[in-house]
Amino acid sequence: MPRKKPFSVKQKKKQLQDKRERKRGLQDGLRSSSNSRSGSRERREEQTDTSDGESVTHHIRRLNQQPSQGLGPRGYDPNRYRLHFERDSREEVERRKRAAREQVLQPVSAEVLELDIREVYQPGSVLDFPRRPPWSYEMSKEQLMSQEERSFQEYLGKIHGAYTSEKLSYFEHNLETWRQLWRVLEMSDIVLLITDIRHPVVNFPPALYEYVTGELGLALVLVLNKVDLAPPALVVAWKHYFHQCYPQLHIVLFTSFPRDTRTPQEPGGVLKKNRRRGKGWTRALGPEQLLRACEAITVGKVDLSSWREKIARDVAGASWGNVSGEEEEEEDGPAVLVEQLTDSAMEPTGPSRERYKDGVVTIGCIGFPNVGKSSLINGLVGRKVVSVSRTPGHTRYFQTYFLTPSVKLCDCPGLIFPSLLPRQLQVLAGIYPIAQIQEPYTSVGYLASRIPVQALLHLRHPEAEDPSAEHPWCAWDICEAWAEKRGYKTAKAARNDVYRAANSLLRLAVDGRLSLCFYPPGYSEQRGTWESHPETAELVLSQGRVGPAGDEEEEEEEELSSSCEEEGEEDRDADEEGEGDEDTPTSDPGSCLTARNPYALLGEDEC
């Protein structure tokens, strides 16, 4: 055994300093993470297992990973359907932080908000989704799974070989979640693709449309959800855009909380927060449109009269509740059969499955995380039967719901398809869990360059001595100003907690309280045409007919700055489940509003 060498106090001190530097990743001398809790968050992430032994990408980040010592008593793995994204390198994260500190924000023109689906997904390229490889009944389960894993790795290899990580968006790297999509498509007679009306192009992969309508020969219904969050003219413009690009689509406008047309609205105004008491699922706008679309698709092959009768009962019950001033209990109404399929039920079926078997139409619900799939199912049922959350990836396993004896709904976990979208836009779309973001500042800058965040929140520049003087803003300045206004401080040094402030701003955007809507190509030039379009007036009237009566709802309004106090506590933890908060906009002095409660839906925690 070699003789021990003396180790001085000075050497020990130097050793500890070097160890801290390595853990914090501060070899370049940048200590930006010391101003917030992001440093400790990133250090914890470095200690987790982030590699996938067989994956083409060497760094996979498993979001919302739960500690588990093995399978549960029923063989359930809590991490089976977790979101798997490619991890950003530390160099890339630090580069974005420097840009957030140095890059001066400039407002963009309205044309920049126009999104063309051909630029986002590039139809015909390798930006496809994984298909289930050919199989036969002679194959064992192990052989089938091994073949699927090899095919999936080849799929990832093609994408990462054609595009660099900087160009690619976040997309799902978890094969188990894609298997859920395969099963839903195999079971379904009709496929619903749910999108968020604020950015429907983000949630509409053309490869899925071609596969469903072409290879499978199924009808695809595009649901433009949350239409209460966008101006009616923009909703109509998006509807016509998709009809023109994809003529085989059946398009349905949907929202679980229609707005009242008696109050005007201006997108991007200062918002207030409402607290709804009771439930409002029976006031959903869109179930009847979806019924008509399914009737046109089935052409009498399935008896949907029970569904029509249910919609009539829901409308009558909502009207009766408004007159009496009472709300129904969640347990009232006919029972809804809920099934959670096991692995044996998830095994593939034959390619020639019988359509409308036993007189039942199976409707598969597919969409990105946070587009409102679970809220849509609750709106169709008429009460809460599905747990909802604003955390992406909340729906973790395959479930079926019998809406009526002849109508079955299949809920698929949210899937992120590969695209060329900016990752900052994906964060603002609610695709990436905000509590898990390593670097939120560039997303705040992306938002602030498209809507006047500083003016809406009445922020004062951190370096401004004279409030009336003009100062250039960067993303870091906005976060620091919001932290100062909200009182977000670090634990020991009491510095402004910019990381927490950035998370808070992103939550306001995802919840719809800072409204950012994107436009179809050419909308800026034709805005007046769409505002005077007959369908725009019809949409306003339809929302007014089913919208809530203001005299029957008890609301507690709070100013934006004070209502964020509760959110400050939520920022410390991961997003919570539950329902109850709704947001109502109010404008700055002199601005004009067009709708009451246009941000109501995002008060419900979305999945």
UniProtKB/Swiss-Prot annotation:
Biological processes annotated in GO: DNA damage response
Compositionally biased spans, kind Acidic residues: 550-585
Annotated residues for binding of GTP: 225-228, 367-374, 411-415
Post-translational modification Phosphoserine, affected residues: 32-34, 51, 68, 324, 561-563
Modified residues (Phosphothreonine): 48, 50
TM segment ranges: none
Domain CP-type G: 178-418
Region described as Disordered: 1-81, 544-607
Keywords: GTP-binding, Nucleotide-binding, Phosphoprotein
UniProt-listed SUPFAM superfamilies: P-loop containing nucleoside triphosphate hydrolases
Biased composition (Basic residues): 1-14
Ranges annotated as biased composition (Basic and acidic residues): 15-26
GO molecular function terms noted in the UniProt entry: GTP binding; GTPase activity
Family of this protein: Belongs to the TRAFAC class YlqF/YawG GTPase family.
Record function comment: Possible regulatory or functional link with the histocompatibility cluster.
Description of its domains: In contrast to other GTP-binding proteins, this family is characterized by a circular permutation of the GTPase motifs described by a G4-G1-G3 pattern.
Protein's name according to its UniProt entry: Guanine nucleotide-binding protein-like 1
Organism for this UniProt entry: Mus musculus
Lineage: Eukaryota, Metazoa, Chordata, Craniata, Vertebrata
